[in-house]
From Swiss-Prot:
InterPro entries linked to this entry: SUZ, SUZ-C, SZRD1
The protein's name: SUZ RNA-binding domain-containing
Annotated SUZ-C domain residues: 111-152
PROSITE patterns the record matches: SUZ, SUZ_C
Stretches assigned to the SUZ domain: 42-107
Skewed-composition ranges (Polar residues): 66-80
Positions where Phosphoserine occurs in the chain: 37, 39, 51, 105, 107
Region called Disordered, residue ranges: 30-152
The UniProt record lists the keyword Ribonucleoprotein: no
Stretches with biased composition (Basic and acidic residues): 89-100, 113-130
Keywords: Acetylation, Phosphoprotein
Gene it is expressed from: Szrd1
Family listed: Belongs to the SZRD1 family.
């Protein structure tokens, strides 16, 4: 690369054809490398010798599910015992018990009847007792200019 002539600008290199020569040179190099890499990798191939006897073929057994009362259960039937259907009153009683255990109250109506004491009450002051605010709405700039009112 030291003996290569370097052009002053890319325009001179394009006019002299130097860029084209370099591109063709790089293209040839990449094509050579790709040809080398296209050859399949050398992997050792194991050839089995037919003269040696092979072991017996593997045996496949098809197993069935265990029978219950002499009947093979089909995949669609469920083997779980059916849960007894609970009445509405039983479900509500269980719900109330769980709610009492978790939240400490048996029904949601009890909470609604109680006023919420956690929030502090807001004390409103009459308009005339409030102190006037001394906020300057349109400040002046540091140099005495009109600040935000300044038009550009």
């Amino acid at each position: 690369m030291e003996d290569e002539e370097v052009a002053e600008s890319w325009e001179e290199a394009a006019d002299s054809g130097e860029i084209d020569r370099r591109l063709e040179k790089k293209l040839k190099i990449t094509q050579k490398e790709s040809r080398k890499s296209k050859s399949p990798p050398k992997v050792p191939i194991v050839i089995q010798d037919d003269s040696l006897p092979t072991g017996p073929p593997p045996q496949i057994r098809i197993l069935k599910r265990p029978t219950s009362n002499g009947v093979v259960s089909s995949p669609n039937s469920t083997s779980r015992p059916a849960l007894p259907v609970k009445s509405l009153a039983q479900r509500e009683a269980e719900y109330a018990e769980a709610r009492r255990r978790i939240l400490g109250s048996a029904s949601p109506e009890e909470e609604q009847e109680k006023p919420i004491l956690d929030r502090p009450t807001r004390i409103s002051q009459p308009e005339d007792s409030r102190q006037p605010s001394n906020v300057i709405r349109q400040p002046l700039g540091p140099d005495g200019s009109q600040g935000f009112k300044q038009r550009r």
